[in-house]
Amino acid sequence: MKVSAGILCLLLVAATFGTQVLAQPDSVSTPITCCFSVINGKIPFKKLDSYTRITNSQCPQEAVIFKTKADRDVCADPKQKWVQTSIRLLDQKSRTPKP
């Protein structure tokens, strides 16, 4: 009888924790960042630090988020020439070994 009660208790605990894990959606662990508008002007390259491409299907538009040296995030249109040039230059800069 004690063995049966112990097994039942163990099953209840396993079922409780198992449903909590299963109930958590995948999207909870990965926040979604979207741009709802993009900058109209051009940001000088010397002010840019890094970038992230936004291509999530849940976002209203494709965009590039530039992180400035002043630690600000700025959304830009990836189709604009200055954005493409800045991305290329930032990629080159990140591949260049630092002394």
Swiss-Prot record:
Keywords: Chemotaxis, Cytokine, Disulfide bond, Heparin-binding, Inflammatory response, Pyrrolidone carboxylic acid, Secreted, Signal. The modification Pyrrolidone carboxylic acid is found at Q24. Chemotactic factor that attracts monocytes. This protein can bind heparin. The gene is CCL8. Gene3D superfamilies: 2.40.50.40. SUPFAM superfamilies: Interleukin 8-like chemokines. Belongs to the intercrine beta (chemokine CC) family. It is found in: Secreted. One of its GO terms (molecular function) is protein kinase activity. Residues 1-23 form the signal peptide. The keyword Disulfide bond applies. CDD domains: Chemokine_CC. InterPro entries: Chemokine_b/g/d (IPR039809), Chemokine_CC_CS (IPR000827), Chemokine_IL8-like_dom (IPR001811), Interleukin_8-like_sf (IPR036048). It comes from the Eukaryota. Disulfide bonds join C34-C59, C35-C75. PROSITE patterns: SMALL_CYTOKINES_CC. One of its GO terms (biological process) is cell-cell signaling. This is C-C motif chemokine 8. Monomer or homodimer; in equilibrium. It comes from Bos taurus. One of its GO terms (cellular component) is extracellular space.
